[in-house]
Structures are given as structure tokens and as C-alpha cells.
Amino acid sequence: MHLGWWKDEVEPFAAQWETLSRAAGAKKTAFLLGDFNSEADVRGEGYDLVLCSGWQDTYRLAQQRDEGYTVMQAIDGWRDAPDAAAKKRIDQIWCSQAIAVKSTRVVFDGLQEPQVSDHAGVLIEL
């Protein structure tokens, strides 16, 4: 999935999240994953909204984890941000309930696997 930015005037994150979480929330165990366009370390925006909605960040649940950054440099859509060159964890895997997660790691970041996009992927092992 690919969500909009928190302050997007046309398709704001909060409205997209409300629709998405309502559709996925009826499932016993559901996973939502992809580009959330919401930095995990920025408070009061998309990441916190998802967390406060009762969803679990599998990165935080994992027994083993790497740094988790899926964006390593300035990319389209973020180039004008004051911290454009900073590493970001905007691609996430969320679960509708707390589960046991053995590990999480970034993949296709150009280090262990070829880079295939301006974002790296995320892989979890349950």
C-alpha cells in the first residue's frame, strides 16, 4: 500500500487511514504493509495515529531487528523537507494484534540484495 502525507490537502493520511483501518479491522488477524509516508520517530502524526488505533508495529515486536531504515537519502516527495537527507523508517509492517515476531530486517537496500527502488523493503519472520 502507499499512503499520503500527513498534511496532504487532497488525500490526507488520517482520512486514508480511517478507511483502510475500518476495512482491515474486521479481520481476526490482519497485516498492513507498505509505504506509510510517515516517519516512525515523528510524534503526533501518522505513525502515532496507527499505533493509537490499536495496531502493532512488527518492528517494535521483533526479538531481533536491524536499524529499520528504508529510505537512506533524499527521495521524491521528501526533497524539500528540512531533514531530506536523513534516514527514515517510513515503510512498515503493522499487525492488528500483538504477535510473536522473531526478526525484522530491511531488504533490497543495495547492501545485501540489489536496490530495486528508492525505498528498501521490509521482511519479518514469525
Language model: regions and residue ranges:
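Active-site regions of metal-assisted phosphoester/phosphodiester hydrolases
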Residues: 1-126
